[in-house]
């Protein structure tokens, strides 16, 4: 999956609603700040691994130097995680919860030069099992 596909699915209602199987960063990132250094180091390693994967995406890697690709990937990842956290903080049926996801997803995909496919809903294939 390329970066656009990852963010299309990550910043979605299905991911937001899948609290039990969703991203550890979004679910526990706030709690990690109060944990021992070993836990925070594990979170850091997970973030680094995800950044490595995103930076390898051709859309990001051809945008300049590896450092520039990393900066872009980090900015998008932080925006995506923040979108999930803030959307989850709202009631599930809140218009604001959905707006947060829509605005952030569009901004991230726009920065990648991508838009959702007309026939692909961001929640496709992400129904909790």
Model-derived regions: residue spans:
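Hydrophobic alpha-helical connector segments
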Residues: 1-22
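Hydrophobic/aromatic-rich alpha-helical bundle segments in the mid-to-C-terminal region
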Residues: 37-44, 58-123
């Amino acid at each position: 999956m390329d970066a656009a596909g990852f963010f299309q699915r990550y910043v979605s209602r299905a991911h937001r609603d899948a609290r039990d199987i969703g991203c550890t960063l979004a679910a526990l990132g706030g709690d990690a700040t109060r944990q021992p250094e070993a836990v925070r180091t594990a979170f850091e390693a997970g973030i680094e691994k995800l950044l490595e994967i995103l930076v390898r995406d051709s859309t990001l890697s051809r945008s300049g130097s590896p450092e520039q690709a990393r900066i872009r990937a980090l900015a998008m990842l932080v925006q995506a995680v923040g979108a999930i956290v803030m959307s989850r903080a709202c009631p599930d049926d809140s218009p604001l919860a959905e707006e947060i996801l829509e605005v952030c997803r569009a901004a991230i995909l726009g920065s990648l030069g991508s838009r959702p496919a007309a026939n692909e809903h961001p929640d496709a294939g992400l129904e909790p099992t």
